Amino acid sequence: MSEAPKKRWYVVQAFSGFEGRVATSLREHIKLHNMEELFGEVMVPTEEVVEIRGGQRRKSERKFFPGYVLVQMVMNDASWHLVRSVPRVMGFIGGTSDRPAPISDKEVDAIMNRLQQVGDKPRPKTLFEPGEMVRVNDGPFADFNGVVEEVDYEKSRLKVSVSIFGRATPVELDFSQVEKA
């Protein structure tokens, strides 16, 4: 009795913006052709981010790898043709066009760890770092430039050193009140 070949992870390039649809179509094709034993997971790694638009907090999903779908599969002619036959799939990444290379276990572990770290707390869409130049776009300090001193992601606030009358003055602002300079 021979052991079943091991499923490896492959990166499939899809039309940008259609990653979710490609993943869904691929799952449907797998079921339709009774090839479940050759395939494992099909996923589009995402994280939840928070952005502030018009003073409103909005949650949205950001893809880790825009334009790519990760597929766990046993590579053979039948599975290769099935993936290639899915609409909006451009091909595999790595290796040659007819013999794709799987991504390493180390890379898979790094992706899985990143997905687990995302957890429940959505991240802000725009990330600020101390020392970064920002422009205040709202409030009494609108149109002033400043340097980020501290970032509080829990409260979505920044401490910015704004130059007022030639003196650096620390000002606490909301993420929505500043933009990158």
Swiss-Prot record:
Biological processes per GO annotation: DNA-templated transcription termination; regulation of DNA-templated transcription elongation; transcription antitermination; transcription elongation-coupled chromatin remodeling
Q: What does this protein do?
A: Participates in transcription elongation, termination and antitermination. In the absence of Rho, increases the rate of transcription elongation by the RNA polymerase (RNAP), probably by partially suppressing pausing. In the presence of Rho, modulates most Rho-dependent termination events by interacting with the RNAP to render the complex more susceptible to the termination activity of Rho. May be required to overcome a kinetic limitation of Rho to function at certain terminators. Also involved in ribosomal RNA transcriptional antitermination.
Task: Please give the PROSITE patterns that the UniProt record associates with this protein.
Answer: NUSG
Gene Ontology CC terms, in alphabetical order: cytosol
Record-stated family: Belongs to the NusG family.
NCBIfam families, sorted: nusG
Alphabetically ordered keywords of this record: Transcription, Transcription antitermination, Transcription regulation, Transcription termination
Q: Does the keyword Coiled coil apply?
A: no
Q: In this protein, which residues make up the domain named KOW?
A: 130-161
Record the organism: Escherichia coli O6:H1 (strain CFT073 / ATCC 700928 / UPEC)
Q: What is this protein called?
A: Transcription termination/antitermination protein NusG
Keyword Cell membrane annotated: no
Q: Whom does it interact with, and what assembly results?
A: Monomer. Interacts with the transcription termination factor Rho and with RNA polymerase.
Pfam families named in the record: KOW, NusG
CDD domains (UniProt xref)? KOW_NusG (cd06091), NGN_Bact_1 (cd09891)
Superkingdom of source = Bacteria
